[in-house]
Amino acid sequence: IMPSLVGSEMCIRDSHYLHHQPGGQPYADEATMAWAVADAAADTGLGLTVLPVLYERAGLAQAALRPDQRRFAGTPDFIARLQASVQASGRPLVNAGVAIHSLRAAASPSIDALLAQVGDAAMPIHIHVAEQMQEVRDCLTHTGQRPMAWLAQRHALDARWQLVHATHSVPEEIEAVARSGAGIVICPSTEGNLGDGFADLPAWLGAGVPMALGSDSHVGRQWPEELRWLEYGQRLHLQQRNVAAAPAQQPATAARLLDAAVQ
């Protein structure tokens, strides 16, 4: 928490994975780890939205978690309870939403069950999606659709949804997300560290999709550097300069990126 504050981050959303003891046994208070994060944020004065993560399997073709992932396990009921507990706790600067790790880590019926409990409540809903091409290939194999196309068709995406990474897309998916009002969260340092690839930044900006910056695995914790490398990565990928600039709208690259990131 403190490194985030030092890195000029004043308000963050935390994908909260770590729920249980080593080995997967629950704590006496099932929200123990959520309280630890929330209290750290309150102590440092950092605005925090805790996003308990639905995580139940190791992959689209794997029905269970690996032993080293059991600390992350959570049912839809459990995730909904954690969200409600944190939101009702009254801690200063602390709110709560929910997260679905990814289509590969949560089965469709479980996603449906969690969203049914969320209903129309005004809370953020995050999901990692289309981060790597292997995920896209697996999703095509198991569902017949690309990840963002599946999400847009299967669920009523709206402005509460934030699609984290959204690295590998086709125009039809970008159009569907734009129509829904959902946003994307690009995480340049993590995507670079993991070799994920480059999001189609010109297309996302051109479609008017709301964009935020994320650190995801906390490889970097300084948002100005994340913003810088968002543009630099695009320049390297496309072999051109001022990728984010829009001469007819906002000719200054930095200004357009900053406007997009803070809207």
Regions found by a protein language model. Give the residues of each.
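His/Asp/Glu-enriched, well-ordered alpha-helical/loop segment
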Residues: 149, 153-160, 202-263
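Histidine/acidic-residue-rich catalytic or RNA/ligand-binding cores of hydrolases
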Residues: 60, 133-145, 171-179, 195-204, ...
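Conserved, mostly hydrophobic/aromatic
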Residues: 41, 98, 128, 177, ...
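Glycine-enriched alpha-helix->loop->beta-strand junction motifs that scaffold or abut catalytic
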Residues: 115-124, 156-159, 176-185, 206-211, ...
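Short, acidic/turn-prone active-site loops that include or flank metal/cofactor-
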Residues: 131, 188-193, 216-219
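Metal-coordinating catalytic core of metallo-dependent amide/deamination hydrolases
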Residues: 23-167
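Catalytic beta/alpha-barrel core
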Residues: 161-169, 187-190, 214
